[in-house]
Amino acid sequence: MGFSKKTYTKEELLPFFDRTRSRGPDMSQILETPSGWLCFHRLAIMGLTEAGMQPFELDGDYVVCNGEIYGFRPLKRQLTEKGYSFRSGSDCEILLPLYREYGLEMFAKLDAEFALIIYDSKRDELIAARDPIGIRPLYYGYDRSGAIVFASEPKNLVGCVRDPPLPAGTLLRGRKICIRYADLTTVTQYSPDDLETVCRNIRNKLIAAVDKRLDADAPWLPALRG
């Protein structure tokens, strides 16, 4: 969760936060920013130690992310070569260095499923973003003072004036600046390949999609459905 203002004390926001404790049973954290709050329940998958707990911090900026960053290890090596250091094996720890390097353009560069909130200390504002497909949920509403509140589930926002979920492939900066950084419904070109080639390419993409999801420090179990 993210609160853009300190309308609530830490004790007052706990009932909102605790409604989704089951989403992250491993650890929980509430961080006070200069103007608001960031809250995170952790389900540890990458970087299982306490060092992988969020929010992550970089020079006064903070991030909380419900997501998986695919292929993060090459990105991490590139950022290390640029002088960034990391304290955990979490894939999400690369997000603030990426934000430092690319700003809002970082979201279009990610191969990931995510719903995240960044606190930008220089602007003293929250930036919320959701992956291009909308795999990870992100809702927002307004508290009793009109401050914006972000959450993973609508029940976190009971008592707030709620808006629809943040659309897939968009980011919200501050209260009003909504930017679409990706639109998968727009087709820019069509494949001229024959049916056999198309089917082979689809098969290869499906294999690659499964393979990149197998990178985890926690034990995993495949489940088939459909």
Where are these regions (language model features)?
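Cysteine-centered catalytic environments shared across enzyme families
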Residues: 1-226
